[in-house]
Amino acid sequence: MQKQARIEPFLFFSYCFTKIMSISHSSPPSDASISPKSPLFLFGLLVFIGFSRYLPLDHSDFFNFSPTLAIFLIAGSYLRGIWSWTAPLCAVFVSDLFLNAAYGMNWLEPYMMITCLSYLVIFGLGKWIGPTRKLTFLAGGAIGSAVLFHIITCSFSWIANPAYIKSVGGLLQAWTFGEPGFTPAYMFLKNSVLSTLFFSFALRWAISLKPAQIPHAQTKTAS
């Protein structure tokens, strides 16, 4: 049930995100949430998530290295309004439709619904954390997001996959080593924790930029 992970260039990711955030707000958002008002916000998230999930990396050391969890965590913490959760969820849903087709799977797999539910849980965690300035809170939220996602999705794999014994031992196997013959589940968890930490701090940095610090923001304001 595990999907091959993706990785994307950090410079491209952070640059594009700061461009969209420069459109979405015109003042430092450190003290309040951001309300994304531009349709480009939805388009940007579609590009970000879709791009990150379509770049395969065959080396198992990087499986599950993705910004997706960080996007939902930061969206919950710093964005408000209906777009704060519908935009990233639509991006995941649309990219999943194409990924499932590429892997020869049905367009609407039960696993797809479970992952979307997991993302909403992480979004709720971000709402609970809020736009904190304390990096320790953000780090805790990032680690908690990765662990929650791992437990929810691996537990569903344990239920749905006949390769697992339906016992406590089988559940622990799903959480730790996974299905025999495949990359161990703990590798996915490790990379999920590292990537969520990395991209959460990257997104937090991008959001904290003042308009004058964002490329071309001064030119846009002057015009």
Where are these regions (language model features)?
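Central hydrophobic cores of alpha-helical transmembrane segments
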Residues: 45, 85-95, 138-146
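Positively charged N-terminal leader segments that act as targeting/secretion signals
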Residues: 2-11
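Membrane-embedded alpha-helical hairpins and interfacial helices in multi-pass inner-membrane proteins
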Residues: 133-212, 216
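Structural signal for the C-terminal ends of transmembrane alpha-helices
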Residues: 51, 74-82, 121-133, 205-211
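Interfacial aromatic-anchored transmembrane helix boundaries in multi-pass membrane proteins
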Residues: 52-64, 90-128
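Short, charged juxtamembrane terminal tails flanking transmembrane helices
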Residues: 22-31, 212-223
